[in-house]
């Protein structure tokens, strides 16, 4: 028989009554009064009374069997009169007389997948993310409970394993063939559905927090840098200069051929500057020779520069400047002063004057690298020869400062005691007074060290002990028979050190520290 549900058609009176007749039991669900009385009697009877009851039952069954056969014939005859008074016959009469159309909606209108009103009223929807349970309305006790089958049919069990698998897979419940179910099962039981709605994950707003952005590192384009250098050199170049060559135009093998360090080139230049003195006839030629070094290196650099082409743009780093006048004047004055010193002074003064001039020239050239700015990456490819010319053509500064005074390490060790003396006076002390204190401390420590050295060598000791210092203090007159070492400690040491050095009895015969 086809499965009847609310979705098949309109809920008319006829369909409702038909469902009630199909689901209603032919027998009354109430137990007879005689069966309840018999159950109560069974509980109250003893084993002896049970035996008597069994004998009477057998006789009563025989009598009742004959009476039943007679009663059946009478029931068939009186069924016509009793059917008019039962609710079942009344419902059948209503079905025969009631119209097929609905009383609410006279014209039958088919609505696809319409939700029944009874199920809507009974549906209890919970909050989002929880279990939604749709239950039908409770029927009067005359109908069967949902999930129970009609009498005489086997109860169909629900397998939880299949149910859990389908819920995990997110598939609808399997619709097994309902051939085993009879037409007596109510449509309300078939509409019993369990729908599980999984809680949706809340939308979280991702915040970056303290995550720092990676630094954007831009690569340096060497070609663009060299192009900018060429543009700057073209803008700052003079129209008549043809001896200037740009840094980018020089061949790369120049930097690879001569790779001597920068410090050696400066040292060689400073040594050559000591012995080469300019003559008044050729001041510019000797300056160029002194700057460029030996002729072999100069010619090699000129050949490299001539290969690069005469029409190349000049570079601001290699612009020739006029030779400085101050070093020549200073050297010339030294030349004039040397004959005068030779006439009126001894040979010792001559030798002392020449190293002084050498020191002056070397100090001027040593100070030049510190004054120059760091070279750009494009210039680092060049050899050390152009750098020599750049450093030589910068104007030099004459340094008149004399040699630095070296501080005596012995006096440097006495400075803490001098500071301690100025602290103990609790008043400002002049510098001359502090110098006298330093001299006194120097003399005292010298005598003390000499005495310790003599005593240690005489006694053959390698370690100075407190007894040696006490003996020296006696010889110096600081410790005598009237003034002992403990008296000096009491006078010049604070209390916390005094308690550790001087033995004292604090409880009976126990002395601290132990002697």
Curated annotation (Swiss-Prot):
PTM annotation (Phosphothreonine): residues: 86
Chain intervals with Basic residues compositional bias: 29-44
Biased composition regions of type Polar residues, renumbered to the chain: 45-58, 296-306
Keyword Nucleotidyltransferase appears in the UniProt entry: no
Cell location: Nucleus; Chromosome, Centromere; Chromosome, Centromere, Kinetochore
Keywords: Cell cycle, Cell division, Centromere, Chromosome, DNA-binding, Kinetochore, Mitosis, Nucleus, Phosphoprotein
Post-translation changes: Dynamically phosphorylated during the cell cycle. Phosphorylated during G2 phase, metaphase and anaphase, but not during telophase or G1 phase.
Residues recorded with modification Phosphoserine: 313, 333, 345-346, 357, 376
Top-rank lineage group of the source organism: Eukaryota
Residue segments, region Disordered: 24-156, 271-411
Gene3D superfamilies documented for this protein: Histone, subunit A
GO cellular component: chromosome, centromeric region; inner kinetochore; nuclear body; nucleus
GO terms for MF: DNA binding; protein heterodimerization activity
Annotated GO biological process: cell division; chromosome organization; chromosome segregation; kinetochore assembly; mitotic cell cycle
Flexible stalk domain as annotated region, ranges: 94-375
Assembly behavior: Component of the CENPA-CAD complex, composed of CENPI, CENPK, CENPL, CENPO, CENPP, CENPQ, CENPR and CENPS. The CENPA-CAD complex is probably recruited on centromeres by the CENPA-NAC complex, at least composed of CENPA, CENPC, CENPH, CENPM, CENPN, CENPT and CENPU. Identified in a centromeric complex containing histones H2A, H2B, H3 and H4, and at least CENPA, CENPB, CENPC, CENPT, CENPN, HJURP, SUPT16H, SSRP1 and RSF1. Interacts (via N-terminus) with the NDC80 complex.
Function: Component of the CENPA-NAC (nucleosome-associated) complex, a complex that plays a central role in assembly of kinetochore proteins, mitotic progression and chromosome segregation. The CENPA-NAC complex recruits the CENPA-CAD (nucleosome distal) complex and may be involved in incorporation of newly synthesized CENPA into centromeres. Part of a nucleosome-associated complex that binds specifically to histone H3-containing nucleosomes at the centromere, as opposed to nucleosomes containing CENPA.
Family: Belongs to the CENP-T/CNN1 family.
Notes on the domains: The largest part of the sequence forms an elongated and flexible stalk structure that is connected to a C-terminal globular domain with a histone-type fold.
Name of the molecule in the record: Centromere protein T
Species this chain originates from: Mus musculus
């Amino acid at each position: 028989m086809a499965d009847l549900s609310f979705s098949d058609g309109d809920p008319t009176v006829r369909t409702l009554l038909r469902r009630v007749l199909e689901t209603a039991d032919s027998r009354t669900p109430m137990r007879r009064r005689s069966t309840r009385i018999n159950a109560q009697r069974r509980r109250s009877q003893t084993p002896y009374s049970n035996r008597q009851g069994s004998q009477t039952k057998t006789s009563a069954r025989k009598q009742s069997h004959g009476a039943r056969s007679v009663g059946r014939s009478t029931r068939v005859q009186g069924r016509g009169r009793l059917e008019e008074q039962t609710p079942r016959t009344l419902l059948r009469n209503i079905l025969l007389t009631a119209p097929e159309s609905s009383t609410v909606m006279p014209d039958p209108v088919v609505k696809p997948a319409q939700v029944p009103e009874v199920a809507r009223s009974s549906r209890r929807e919970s909050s989002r993310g929880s279990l939604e349970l749709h239950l039908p309305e409770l029927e009067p006790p005359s109908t069967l409970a949902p999930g129970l089958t009609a009498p005489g049919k086997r109860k169909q069990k629900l397998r939880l394993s299949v149910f859990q698998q389908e819920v995990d897979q997110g598939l609808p419940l399997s619709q097994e063939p309902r051939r085993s179910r009879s037409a007596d099962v109510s449509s309300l039981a078939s509409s019993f559905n369990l729908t599980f709605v999984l809680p949706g994950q809340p939308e979280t707003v991702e915040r970056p927090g303290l995550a720092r952005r990676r630094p954007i590192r831009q690569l340096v384009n060497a070609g663009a840098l060299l192009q900018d250098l060429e543009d700057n050199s073209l803008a700052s170049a003079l129209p008549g200069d043809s001896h200037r060559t740009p840094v980018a135009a020089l061949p790369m093998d120049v930097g690879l051929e001569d790779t001597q360090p920068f410090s050696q080139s400066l040292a060689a230049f400073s040594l050559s500057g000591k012995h080469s003195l300019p003559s008044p006839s050729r001041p510019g030629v000797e300056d160029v020779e002194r700057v460029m070094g030996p002729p072999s290196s100069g010619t090699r650099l000129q050949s490299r520069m001539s290969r690069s082409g005469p029409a190349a743009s000049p570079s601001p780093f290699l612009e020739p400047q006029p030779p400085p006048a101050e070093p020549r004047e200073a050297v010339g004055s030294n030349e004039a002063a040397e004959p005068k010193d030779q006439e009126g002074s001894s040979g010792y003064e001559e030798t002392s004057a020449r190293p002084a001039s050498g020191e002056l020239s070397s100090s001027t050239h040593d100070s030049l690298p510190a004054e120059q700015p760091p070279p750009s990456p494009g210039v680092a490819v060049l050899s050390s020869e152009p750098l020599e010319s750049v450093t030589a053509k910068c104007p030099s500064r004459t340094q008149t400062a004399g040699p630095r005074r070296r501080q005596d390490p012995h006096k440097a060790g006495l400075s803490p005691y001098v500071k301690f003396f100025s602290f103990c006076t609790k008043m400002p002390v002049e510098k001359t007074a502090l110098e006298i204190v330093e001299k006194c401390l120097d003399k005292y420590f010298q005598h003390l060290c000499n005495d310790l050295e003599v005593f240690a060598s005489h006694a053959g000791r390698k370690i100075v002990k407190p007894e040696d210092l006490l003996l020296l203090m006696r010889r110096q007159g600081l410790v005598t028979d009237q003034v002992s070492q403990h008296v000096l400690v009491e006078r010049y040491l604070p209390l916390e050190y005094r308690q550790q050095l001087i033995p004292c009895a604090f409880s009976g015969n126990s002395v601290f520290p132990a002697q």
